[in-house]
């Protein structure tokens, strides 16, 4: 990247940070205070192409009334779509939408449904990690054409963090900083990964597994069901099952037998790793090993109590949102 690009990135962040104090005040407002803000949030549908595959992109932000807002792109995991998981509306319960929360913080928030998820094309592919990386490569030029920003911030959840890690290795010029949440490095000794490894014959026998409401209930019951409101898997199932009743197996296969896929030494940007108190997809030892190898010293590792694997949909989601917001708004380094 050129020094001109670096200067422009620093300038955008400085302009954004000038409003950080106001953002924090808004974030601390009581729940009822956000209703008007939610009504003002602008939502847009966009599309990308990966050959014959149509990829659905979804954007939410506050109305434009100043300099460009920093772009935050959210990468979903193995079991539900981007819009379904990151913009979830839970009847009778406010503030479950990750996208709304960060739009209120001042971000231009994007996500996508990977191939065979949500509103994107339904094909016969198993939608493995490699497929998801190619999805991101198709999506980011669309984001750039709409926002004018080539280099953006990212969040990846579970297998989405693996997709994101591979993408960052291959297209580092597009990644400003990123959060790897519920990441798996090797999976050795992790209960959920060992379960998938033992079930590999079934996972490779078909590119898909059937999905039902019980599938979504099981995701949230797996690690610690006390960390989630039962209304959440019900709302998620209601959304997802209107779009498809199958889930591709590719990422499960990769996580069972193809780890590691991300080389920490090749991640050049600033990285924050977030680790739930209850998460069977990795061990502390493997994640700390990965973290120790990250070359950029502007890095963070945060283990959070009161949350499980899908922390951003847990009762204590506000705690991981706080960590991410602080990381994404970290002031730029001053010269001596």
Predicted segments — roles?
Residues 1-11, 22:
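N-terminal secretory signal peptides
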Residues 36-64:
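N-terminal cap/lid segment of alpha/beta-hydrolase-fold proteins
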Residues 66-68, 72-104:
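Short, surface-exposed "cap/lid" segments of acyl-processing enzymes
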Residues 280-286:
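Conserved alpha/beta-hydrolase "acid-adjacent" motif
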